[in-house]
Amino acid sequence: MKGVLLSGAPAATLIDVTHEIAPGDIRSAAYVLGRTWHRFPAGTIHLIVVDPGVGSSRAALALSAHGHRFVGPDNGVFTPLLHDAEVEAVELQVREGVSRTFHGRDLFAPAAAALANGEPLTSLGQKFAGIPRRLAYTPPH
């Protein structure tokens, strides 16, 4: 994923917040996102890839909220962003050649790189017609 990101946006700065989330633990990923996103400057692009539903019918999203942009699966991981915020979301289109098992590399990383290069959110896909999935979740303090 990092190679794809840097190939698409060579000037990007990449920061790994954590690698301590158990595979598929969406609730922990949402918690960490809720505790960290606001510590970054406005305009930051956050790529979240905790995705046990890869290859399923779950949507792939890019969204804008709180002056930040976020890319990842519509599996509830964005729950902490959805409270008290105006959210603009687009559904990323799965192109030919995208692996059914590695959307992080083939779908989410190219979208994040496009945003880092100044592409508007709307260039990444159609407006998301649904409501991003929410977990039963208490926001962190």
Question: Which role fits each region the language model picked out?
Answer:
Residues A11-T13, E20-Y31, R35, R39-D106:
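Active-site histidine-anchored catalytic micro-motif
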Residues S99-H141:
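Anionic-ligand-binding alpha/beta catalytic cores of soluble enzymes and soluble regulatory domains
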